[in-house]
Amino acid sequence: MFVEALKRQNPALISAALSLWQQGKIAPDSWVIDVDQVLENGKRLIETARLYGIELYLMTKQFGRNPWLAEKLLALGYSGIVAVDYKEARVMRRAGLSVAHQGHLVQIPCHQVADAVEQGTDIITVFTLDKAREVSAAAVKAGRVQFVLLKVYSDDDFLYPGQESGFVQHSLHEVVAEIKKLPGLHLAGLTHFPCLLWDEAAGKVLPTPNLHTLVQARDQLAKSGIAIEQLNAPSATSCTSLPMLAEYGVTHAEPGHALTGTIPANQQGDQPEYIAMLWLSEISHHFRGDSYCYGGGYYRRGHAQHALVFTPENQKITETNLKTVDDSSIDYTLPLAGEFPVSSAVVLCFRTQIFVTRSDVVLVSGIHRGEPKIVGRYDSLGNSLGA
């Protein structure tokens, strides 16, 4: 999906990854991340958000819940980390990093609510009154007021399978009335997902019905004299989409893919955020005229199509196609069109969610100074593997 953008925006990353691989420093099935470019992308996002009065929570799941990189990004001025599930929150807190937003996309389990409240989580999203009551009890016990967001939806909204949740919009007044009865809670705002999506036919990011529902819910409360401070609209957050979010009165967004430049809008390599990561593998064997590289990092929604194959003997890079991958099977190996020498390096660049892969994550700095250096190795869940 992003091979052409990678070649256009960050050819130095390709060279650095192949050089480190030739030195035996990077193994197959590794996401190689250009740390300096991620930080540059992060700065651009912060600067753009400030122009439009939007606060940004940092999302880490796309780059493998990586605490080292998260800490560097937080220093740029992000309002905190958003943990999309309780295991991501655990990784961040164990690394000494505070979690600003938790509960969306995945609710906090009952026996972890008290810890999330006591740890000082800025805001917690709730999908049910039952969960709101758990948060209320924990807040009272901790002697603090916990800010909460309500996730809302309407019947015609788009929800990904496995993410069906929230309060239906027409019940919002009744829900808010119940929330206001709960001690220790402050209703800070509303959220939904996905609020923006890339439209391939239009060639741009467009608002979803979900964003309209979110805005309508805010206006619905305002007419009843209930003002909210936070309108959180995640999905497809980027330098290009932030102005659109501002037009809708959005106050908070949560960039993830934009940090690595792997947003659908950047397929041609023409966005302010530059590609900052690639997936490196190696030819394992041949079968019936095609080559198979080591798998582990395939993501079925990644739109991976093209690969670069590097043969050390002649220092040649050849572009080929990734053949059809059976999404119902484990990606032990991935098929590439044509025969290439065994143990040649393979580079792909596609949309991923590293935390659901088996990949290693290799952090590299100094690429654009011509001095690439590995500064950290992690697994796909943010656990250090040493330098």
Residue map of PLM features:
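Active-site-proximal beta-alpha core segment in soluble small-molecule metabolic enzymes
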Residues: 57-192, 196-198
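Active-site loop ensemble at the mouth of alpha/beta enzyme cores that anchors a bound cofactor
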Residues: 237-317
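Aromatic/hydrophobic pocket-lining residues that form π-stacking "cages" and hydrophobic walls in ligand
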Residues: 45, 135, 214-217
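Structural beta-strand/beta-sheet cores of well-ordered domains, especially the beta-sheet scaffolds
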Residues: 122, 146, 183, 229, ...
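C-terminal accessory subdomain/extension
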Residues: 290-387
